[in-house]
From Swiss-Prot:
Higher taxonomy: Bacteria, Pseudomonadati, Pseudomonadota, Gammaproteobacteria, Chromatiales
Species in which this protein is naturally found: Nitrosococcus oceani (strain ATCC 19707 / BCRC 17464 / JCM 30415 / NCIMB 11848 / C-107)
UniProt keywords, alphabetically: Cell inner membrane, Cell membrane, Membrane, Metal-binding, Transport, Zinc
Functional description taken from the UniProt entry: Part of an energy-coupled inorganic carbon pump.
Keyword Nuclease among UniProt keywords: no
Subunit structure: Forms a complex with DabB.
Protein name (database record): Probable inorganic carbon transporter subunit DabA
Keyword Signal found: no
Annotated S-S bridges: none
Membrane topology: Peripheral membrane protein
Family: Belongs to the inorganic carbon transporter (TC 9.A.2) DabA family.
């Protein structure tokens, strides 16, 4: 065989490998879109961790057109509200413009004006060119030539007024100062004052909008005898250049769908999307539909090849030759992708880019399918396996047949890139006209003319003379001087902008008049010097700096105040909560209720990863971080004395589940059964519905009581301990229960990580958390992230049971952790929605703990009331100034109301994290905005071994939560899931807006509408030397692959600015901020130092306010014993 033939024989295999590699890389740009039941907060931009935050925003915007910052209008509102001030903007400009901010632009009366002065004004004020009509509106409606602009600082106003007075002692008026300035601006650009009546201004607009020849052409209905202003050869050369530029974009910036949209105005995705979504939803369904696709078990692409399209309601009959093409599809999806790309005549060098382009056109569906592809053990994959290659093959197939239809109907040519290029090279006039029309840049009269021509039959469209005439008119309009008005100096653009800028700079008319035209142009050019991405990043940093200054000031002023820097005194009780920001409030309230309590923060699975099966659960579910794979299974079982009772419970429970299945499924799927059931059950269901609508809290309470009466609860225990048989537990060989060695190992590691190895109180409470609400498809997003989007109660219960075993305490003592005999551990769970707090296994608590437990439960109940009260201030529908009981009732009602789109606010407003002893933050009101994770630097080694583990595991978890909320709040349409009100649950695995939308991932609008999007600022109680050593030990770079990006490398997060790091010295309380290029830099506030307010209770600081509150120091009535850190 010749070398040429050998190369040809090998090329299909080479192409397969290239495509497989290319598809694997797509996870870098696709969201990690887990199904609803496994929803997990992750960084929406996780594929960009290897570059900086700012670079990632720019790259993602270039790829998708989705902006990653708040709109500037929103930032300006925050500025107006005082959430950002001038000092913050100055600091941000100084830190993020690489020294350009200090460049002197000009000096006026000895006063230097630098770029920072101009940039700050351009950020705060909207100083953009106006259209003539908007300019007229400003003059007429706002008296813009008589009054100062809104937002002009008092110092600038005084400067302009004083300059006017110096010129004429009798004319120190605002109106005269503004007129002098306006006339000076006109003189700089040598333009006349348009002092016209409004009707005359309207005529001026028309004259600037169209040239005289175009106006005449319009009035004469576009006479074809219009003179040619540009040689034909030049016009064709320009059109040919545009054509080649557009065709060259296909594969990187455009798909063929985008190319056709640029030439026809039609979006093929509107036709492709409903078919693609209906099929994919049917295949991926997790229990919603009554009928499943045949061949579903063979995979997504295999099911597509054998799909009964008519039965599924997929209308393809109108498309040309789809059946023959479908019959020719190869067996493997990768071969189908190759066949489609070759049929579309996409050059091989652009295949990777082309696949990326079509994948990000529907990122939600692509992301979910990619998620399932990387998790073959995911239970629904057993019935319906899938892969991203399968999805792309189907998408390309649909693109091919729809593109063929458009090109055949429009131009009578084959639907591929080469045919389109060849056709328009022969019909450059038509290309020029179409391209200009669908770029949406033409004036109305030209757009109408081109649209009329497109509406003609195809044979008439090909008339070169018709298209030449229209293209000639378009070229005349483009190259007429009046059409290039943005490059010319005009009153409503250049003069207006200089006029506004001078007011804010405090430049009076006599100083502006000294400027040359080029100097004025330079000033205006600086206004536009910052790119959109740079402006967004500068605003974001200013927003973050404002919060940072308050936060750092609070930590600094609190140094030495907080209790429990050491445990020389024994606390009355210790409560370990998840480090979740929502638990910061209840911890603070507990310490205010009883200052002798100590609270700690820890990952909410408490170091006990399990596959959990509750008493009535048919299957196990993982309760641990998503990056951890449990090797132990834990079952809840009835206690020996309740086994007989459990038999009845099980029968009644199964019967109840059977009735629910009949009610939910038969009424939707079976014609006869549904008719009977609806007639029989209608009166009762009407009463239930009325209760849910008008009395949700009472209805839910009645439902719980009825369920308890019909299916009596059973006392349970954990099947916790098993003997060590020498077999290693693995993810594929789960151990049911834990050996003594495993229990001691997990407890010791956990207690050391949170710095809790001594000073145990008589009662130690571990509180997991979760959230219960009605009609909430994203319920898992409110649960414990450290427990994998599940409740943390089972983990807390398991830890407490382990820690109470004498055998385990003996093993811990061998490792230097001595738990006294008079200490008892109790597991609980905090419902962050209803503020309920069930306690586990209280009947096992020894009687001698009863008085202390009774007192502690009363204090916890009081703290829950206070927590509910604090939460109510951020909820628009909550009563204003509620009593504690009213607040508790309100938050409980929200969880039972199936119409409530905001049962709780989740992680909204989270902005910071603190890793250290409780003494660092105790006594500070942090407004439920801070992850508070316990760590004791005094028990760690010199290398920071414990701290390194904490940072590597907790850091990415906090970043994932924070950035999910950040992006969903900054651009909910681009990154979030839209409003819950319009969401439709699809296949029980996702939500869409409407019926044929992209699958919407991440947070809904109602979850983030009060969120202040900023990156998490993580302060670690450690020396800078220790943190620097840990930082240097981390891998400097790591490309995400195969799903490893779920736990991104710590150094990538820090280097890229995804996580903002600072250190607080354990002894001095001095704060240093980390910069990847310079290391740790001592923090020095750019504000004037001022003492924080001191209040007796948190309520004294937040009550009556609905916006975020800055930190304050809390000093309860009872005097605490202070221990220096």
């Amino acid at each position: 065989m010749s070398a040429h033939h050998a190369e040809q024989a090998e090329s299909p295999l080479d192409n397969r490998e290239k495509l497989t590699t290319a598809v694997d890389k797509l996870e870098l740009v696709l969201p990690c879109a887990a199904p609803l039941y496994d929803f997990m907060h992750l960084n929406t931009m996780q594929g960009y961790h290897h570059i900086s935050f700012a670079e990632a925003m720019a790259a993602h915007f270039e790829l998708t057109g989705i902006r990653g910052y708040l709109p500037e209008e929103d930032f300006r509102k925050h500025y107006a509200r005082g959430r950002i001030d001038d000092a913050d903007l100055n600091e941000s400009l100084a830190n993020n413009t690489h020294g350009r901010n200090r460049e002197i632009v000009l000096k006026v009366s000895g006063r230097p004006i630098n770029k920072q002065d101009i940039w700050r004004i351009s950020l705060i004020q909207d100083i953009n060119p106006l259209s003539p009509s908007r300019f007229r509106w400003q003059i007429k409606e706002y008296d813009a030539l008589e009054r100062f602009q809104n937002g002009v600082p008092k110092s600038a106003r005084d400067t302009l007024l004083n300059a006017t007075q110096e010129t004429d002692q009798n004319r120190r008026t605002e109106s005269q100062a503004i007129r002098d300035l306006w006339e000076a601006c006109l003189r700089v650009f040598q333009l006349e004052n348009p002092n016209l009546h409004s009707e005359e201004l309207g005529e001026l607009v028309d004259l600037e909008e169209f040239s005289r020849s175009q106006a005449e052409g319009k009035q004469s209905k576009f006479r074809t005898s219009q003179p040619t202003l540009i040689p034909q050869e030049e016009m064709l050369a320009e059109a040919r250049k545009d054509l080649h530029h557009l065709v060259d974009k296909v594969g990187e910036e455009l798909s063929l769908r985008g190319l056709l949209q640029a030439l026809t105005g039609e979006d093929l995705l509107d036709q492709v999307r409903p078919i693609l979504i209906r099929f994919c939803a049917s295949h991926l369904d997790e229990g919603f539909t009554a009928w499943s696709l045949p061949e579903r078990g063979q995979g997504l692409y295999a099911a597509w090849r054998k799909c009964p399209f008519a039965e599924l309601g997929l209308d393809l009959a109108r498309l040309p030759d789809w059946q023959s093409f479908h019959a020719e599809l190869p067996e493997h999806s990768v071969d189908a992708v190759i066949a489609c790309l070759e049929r579309l005549k996409i050059p091989e060098s652009r295949w990777e880019g082309y696949l990326k382009r079509i994948a990000v056109e529907l990122p939600g569906w692509s992301g979910l399918i990619n998620w399932r592809h990387h998790r073959p053990k995911y239970k629904p994959n057993r019935k319906a396996p899938t892969s991203l290659m399968d999805y792309l093959a189907i998408r390309l197939f649909l693109d091919v047949i729809h593109i063929e239809q458009v090109t055949q109907n429009t131009w009578g040519i084959a639907g591929n890139l080469e045919e389109l290029k060849t056709y328009f090279e022969n019909y450059l006039w038509e290309f020029s006209g179409r391209y200009a029309l669908f770029s949406n840049t033409l004036p109305e009269y030209l757009a109408i003319r081109a649209q009329e021509l497109i509406a003609l039959p195809r044979t008439a469209q090909k008339d070169r003379e018709n298209w030449r005439t229209v293209s000639n008119m378009i070229h005349n309009w483009k190259h007429n001087p009046s059409a290039e008005r943005t490059k010319r100096q005009t009153v409503h653009s250049h003069v207006w902008r200089l006029f506004c800028l001078a007011q804010h700079l405090g430049l009076p008319g006599n100083e502006v008049g000294k400027l040359s035209s080029s100097e004025a142009e330079q000033l205006l050019a600086i206004l536009d010097e910052l790119t959109t991405s740079e402006r967004g990043y500068i605003w974001l940093c200013a927003y973050e700096y404002h919060y940072r200054e308050d936060y750092f000031a609070a930590l600094t002023q609190n140094h030495g105040r907080g209790r429990w820097a050491n445990r020389n005194e024994r606390p009355e009780a210790q409560l370990i909560f998840c480090f979740d920001d929502r638990e910061e409030g209840i911890r603070r309230h507990l310490e205010e209720v009883n200052p002798n309590l100590e609270t700690l923060g820890a990952p909410g699975f408490f170091g006990v990863p399990i596959q959990w099966r509750g008493l009535d659960y048919p299957d196990t579910t993982p309760h641990c971080p998503v990056v951890v794979t449990p090797v132990n299974e834990l079952h809840e079982e009835p206690r020996p004395e309740a086994k007989k009772r459990y038999g009845l419970h099980k029968r009644l429970y199964n019967f109840k589940q059977f009735l629910l299945r009949v009610l939910h499924n038969k009424t939707r799927r079976d014609l006869l059964t549904s008719k009977v059931l609806i007639d029989v059950l209608f009166p009762g269901m009407l009463a239930v519905l009325a209760g849910k609508v008008f009395f949700p809290f009472q209805q839910a309470s009645l439902k719980r009581k009825a369920t308890a009466a019909l299916v009596p609860p059973v006392p349970t225990q954990l099947k916790l301990t098993v003997p060590d048989d020498g077999t290693e537990a693995t993810p594929d060989n789960l151990r049911v229960g834990f050996t003594d060695a495993e229990q001691a190992e997990r407890l010791a590691a956990f207690l050391r990580a949170i710095g809790f190895t001594s000073g145990f109180a008589p009662l130690v409470v571990l509180s997991g958390h979760g959230s219960m609400s009605e009609n909430n498809p994203q319920l898992a997003s409110y649960d414990c992230g450290a427990s994998g989007g599940r409740h943390g109660g089972p983990n807390a219960r398991a830890f407490a049971a382990m820690a109470n075993r004498p055998e385990i305490r003996a093993r811990l003592a061998e490792q230097g952790i001595h738990i006294p005999d008079d200490t008892w551990f109790i597991g609980t769970e905090h419902d962050t929605c209803s503020e309920s707090f069930p306690w586990f296994d209280l009947d096992k608590v020894p009687a001698n703990f009863a008085p202390a437990l009774k007192k502690l439960k009363a204090e916890v109940d009081q703290a829950l009331l206070l927590s509910a009260h604090e939460r109510c201030r951020r909820m628009a529908s909550a009563p204003r100034k509620p009593s504690l009981q009213q607040a508790r009732r309100h938050v409980a009602e929200r969880g039972t109301d199936f119409s409530q789109a905001r049962p709780e606010l989740g992680h909204a407003t989270v902005a910071s994290a603190l890793i250290g002893r409780r003494s660092v933050t105790r006594g500070i009101f942090l407004d439920r905005r801070c992850f508070v994770l316990s760590y004791d630097p005094t028990i760690d080694d010199a290398e920071g071994t414990i701290l390194e583990g904490v940072l590597k595991n907790a850091g990415p978890v906090g970043v994932g939560i924070n950035l999910d909320y950040y992006f969903s709040a900054a651009n909910n349409q681009g990154f979030g899931s839209g409003s819950k009100v319009a969401q439709n649950v699809t296949g029980l695995f996702g939500v869409m807006q409407g019926i044929d939308d992209d699958l919407r991932t991440w947070c809904s609008y109602q979850m983030v509408d009060v969120h202040e999007p900023m990156r998490v600022l993580t302060v670690v109680e450690a020396t800078t030397e220790t943190l620097t050593a840990i930082y240097k030990r981390q891998p400097s770079s790591q490309e995400p692959a195969g799903g490893s990006w779920l736990l991104p490398p710590l150094r990538q997060l820090i280097d890229g600015g995804w996580l903002l790091l600072a250190a607080i010295h354990p002894k001095t309380g001095k704060i240093s901020v980390f910069d990847p290029k310079q290391g740790f830099i001592p923090w020095k506030s750019y504000r004037e130092p001022s003492p924080l307010p001191v209040v007796e209770r948190s309520m004294d600081w937040y009550d009556g306010y609905s916006d975020p509150r800055p930190p304050a120091l809390v000093e309860p009535k009872q005097t605490e014993t202070h221990h220096a850190a």
